[in-house]
Amino acid sequence: MSLFLLLINSVATFFILYIFRRKIMSLIAKKTYYFFQKFPVKSNRAVFSSFSGKYYSDNPKYLYLECIKNHPNIECIWVVDDNRIDIPGKAIKVRNKSFKHLYYMATSKYWIFNARIPAMFTKREEQVYLQTWHGTPLKKLGLDMDVAYFATANYKHNFYKNAQRWDYLVSANKFSTKVFQSSFGVDKDIIVECGYPRNDILINHSESDVLKVKNSLNIEGDKKVILYCPTWRDDQKRTDKQYGFNLKLDLCRLKEKFGDSAIILLRMHYLIADNLDLTGVEDFAYDVSNYPDIQELYIVSDIMITDYSSTMFDYTNLKKPVILYTYDLDKYKDILRGFYFDIMNLSPGPIVIEHPELEDEIEKGLSGKLTYNEDFYNEFCTIERGNASNKILNTMIS
């Protein structure tokens, strides 16, 4: 019994010290940031971050590339979790949550992010905060959600307060502009409706760009490429920031049927924690979840499979086939999130529930018998012109 009590006491002590340490570190960070706010804001400095430092990717990446090309006087700072993340140009990399991170947040005129940031980062009057966000929403978002499985008690309040710091919010289409006003609680005046910077490459890419990506992934030139991009499920939370995912693809069956002429790239959502077991299908299925830029995966693929992910909106810009594999459709739309529109009436491509149906649609897609939905394209993709990055920076840097 005494050994058991000793163990319990040890565990309790560990957690108390852990919580205490986190609170102390948080307090130090806040005080340090407040101190750095006494320094002047540099008018030619911009700080970038993609998914809170996890990647060099998405809208911030393409705004950065535009910035170093056409605004060389801007000093660019990139917030990263790992200093090994490769960033071209002369950007200064700073570790997320480091003192340098706090300093540059306090002294950079421009903030360019695609996800929410901690509440401690109060914005000074002369600073400009561009929130690019990271997708056209099918799933209900923020203030529009009836139930948030992953949320804290103050989720909606914090969500709203976070959005009130934004000076500009990027929208890819009229639909998003309307949704963002209700889901974020922002005025239409701050929304820049011009397409997504990350989609510029989808409009402007060349065949050499495609070959470069294929070579980096060791994809044989004559093989067709299937891209699978599922989203995360709100009710499969594993840890504070990670979710599980039960892969519903029969990869052995798909290899047997399509392995001679195609491969499949598996791109899991960044919130999904599971490692994929590809035993037996290593020469057919490839886990590209950590590939830094999903846009590059779009341009090398011939067909995409997704479910409720915003990838469907971006990918349709390529006018390539999209299949929605929605094996849990009723649960997802009615219980977990809810949708902004009826996906059954307006879809980028065929919706399938069962695996045999999926196989049939893949076969059609690979043989050229499946096309994109023009109505879906016209609703969500028509303002993309390949110049969103240029328009946004010209609006922001005046």
Specify the residue positions occupied by each region the protein language model found.
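Membrane-proximal basic amphipathic "stem/tether" segments
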Residues: 1-47, 51-52
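Nucleotide donor/acceptor-binding cores
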Residues: 43-44, 127, 223-226
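Active-site and donor-binding regions of nucleotide-sugar-utilizing enzymes
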Residues: 46-205
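Conserved catalytic-core segment of nucleotide-activated headgroup transferases in glycan assembly
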Residues: 57-71, 197-278, 352-354, 388-390
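Donor nucleotide-activated moiety binding/catalytic core segment of transferases
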Residues: 94-110, 116, 270-313
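A donor-sugar binding/catalytic signature common to diverse glycosyltransferases
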Residues: 111-140, 291-336
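Catalytic binding pocket for nucleotide-activated donors in carbohydrate/polymer assembly enzymes
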Residues: 281-283, 310-380
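C-terminal alpha-helical cap of glycosyltransferases
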Residues: 385-398
